């Protein structure tokens, strides 16, 4: 089997694994706040389960990178899938016991699983070179398109399957998804890496030096902005929808449209990046996120919520995939593990904070305030991105 064939095989496997693994977050996001409302006596804590999911994602990135480095991606990913199965069982147990604490432990554990799933996009680039990196990332993210349908539909199909424990069935289905991922991940094979004999002991630059690189800082900032703003608005959306008189099914379908929009562009995002460049597509993503806030501020009908969530998802896709591709240009193969791990730790740590503050801010200030905050944060990253593009344009004209 040639390296190219092995790489394509791994992309297919990772895409299927992504479809299964990425079906879990929509369940947590759709129901985390609603279950929080039932189990928590403090309205400010209703989004804590979703925040802990994102915190688990952030805290899990560095251990996941360590396990991948020590035991290989396949073994680490299978461990992650087992953790995902356990997470669903724990969350369901919390609902059965009417325990907010146990339920939160389940969503935190689900975040640990998500930290492995998030790195599938980097695993796809292990044997890719040049422009193929962006396409490899993009194709693995296509698995999320299936997840966009499976996750929310599981919520609708299973939310009342156990009458005395509303939503417990949905989290048990989450456990099944983790178990189904195990045989898929078992087929993953690490690509052969041709090592430079002169670089056997090369560990690359110290992490501190990488973190101080302006290029790395901008790449991480773009990813953080795209993901944190998406999570900030998305976490508040289901609660805001129900609060404005819409049904739980409407809220779940809103998340489904949102997640579909997050992953559907992946069919062509890689090609767009190849044609127009990483920075331009990332900037376009940020503009679309700002546009989603404009739609959200237009009213409280189902159409306003769904329209905002759809453009928020498309903006996330361009911003996140573009920023991920930017990060892969900021490190050598020897620096890959620590650079990618640091990127995800910073990004998902910020995402955890964003999801937590979404709940308290929604309770204290309302849905409009959530969306007004999008504009200054987008501007903070969009301006440096545009300034980075200007010299290239000037050089091209000269």
From Swiss-Prot:
Its main location: membrane. Keywords: Cell membrane, Membrane, Transmembrane, Transmembrane helix, Transport. Belongs to the major facilitator superfamily. Transports riboflavin into the cell. It comes from the Bacteria. The gene is rfnT. Pfam families: MFS_1 (PF07690). GO terms for cellular component: plasma membrane. This is Riboflavin transporter RfnT. It is a multi-pass membrane protein. The chain crosses the membrane at residues 13-35, 45-67, 74-91, 95-117, 137-156, 166-188, 220-242, 252-274, 281-300, 305-324, 345-367, 372-389. PROSITE patterns: MFS. InterPro entries: MFS, MFS_dom, MFS_trans_sf. GO terms for molecular function: transmembrane transporter activity. The lineage of its organism: Bacteria, Pseudomonadati, Pseudomonadota, Alphaproteobacteria, Hyphomicrobiales. It is found in: Cell membrane. Coiled coil: none annotated. It comes from Brucella anthropi (strain ATCC 49188 / DSM 6882 / CCUG 24695 / JCM 21032 / LMG 3331 / NBRC 15819 / NCTC 12168 / Alc 37).
């Amino acid at each position: 089997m040639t390296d190219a064939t092995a790489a394509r095989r791994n992309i297919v496997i990772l895409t299927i694994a992504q479809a299964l693994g990425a079906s879990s977050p929509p369940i947590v996001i759709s129901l985390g706040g609603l279950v929080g409302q039932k189990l928590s006596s403090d309205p400010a804590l209703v989004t804590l389960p979703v925040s802990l999911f994102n915190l688990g994602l952030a805290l899990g990135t560095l251990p996941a990178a360590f396990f991948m480095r020590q035991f290989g991606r396949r073994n680490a990913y299978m461990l992650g899938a087992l953790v995902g199965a356990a997470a669903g069982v724990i969350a369901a147990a919390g609902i059965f016991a009417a325990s907010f604490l146990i339920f939160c432990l389940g969503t935190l554990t689900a975040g640990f699983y998500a930290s492995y799933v998030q790195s599938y996009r980097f695993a796809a680039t292990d044997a890719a070179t040049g422009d193929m990196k962006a396409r490899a990332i993009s194709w693995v993210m296509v698995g999320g398109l299936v997840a966009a349908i499976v996750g929310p539909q599981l919520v609708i199909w299973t939310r009342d399957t156990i009458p005395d424990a509303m939503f417990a069935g949905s989290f048990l289905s989450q456990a099944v998804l983790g178990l189904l991922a195990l045989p898929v991940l078992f087929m993953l094979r690490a690509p052969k890496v041709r090592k430079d004999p002169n670089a056997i002991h090369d560990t690359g630059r110290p992490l501190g030096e990488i973190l101080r690189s302006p290029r790395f800082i901008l790449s991480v900032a773009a990813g953080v902005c795209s993901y944190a703003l998406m999570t900030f608005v998305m976490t508040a959306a289901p609660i805001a929808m129900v609060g404005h008189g819409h049904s739980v099914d409407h809220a779940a379908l809103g998340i489904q449209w949102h997640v579909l929009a997050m992953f559907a562009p992946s069919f062509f995002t890689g090609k767009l990046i190849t044609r127009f460049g990483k920075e331009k597509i990332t900037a376009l993503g940020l503009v679309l996120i700002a546009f989603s806030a404009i739609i959200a501020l237009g009213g409280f009908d189902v159409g306003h919520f769904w329209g905002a969530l759809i453009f928020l998802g498309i903006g996330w896709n361009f911003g996140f995939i573009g920023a991920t591709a930017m990060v892969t240009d900021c490190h050598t193969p020897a620096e890959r593990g620590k650079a990618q791990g640091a990127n995800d730790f910073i990004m998902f740590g910020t995402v955890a904070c964003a999801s937590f503050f979404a709940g308290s801010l929604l309770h204290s200030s309302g849905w409009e305030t959530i969306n007004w905050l999008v504009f200054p944060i987008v501007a903070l990253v969009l301006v440096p991105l545009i300034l980075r593009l200007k010299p290239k344009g000037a050089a091209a004209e000269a």
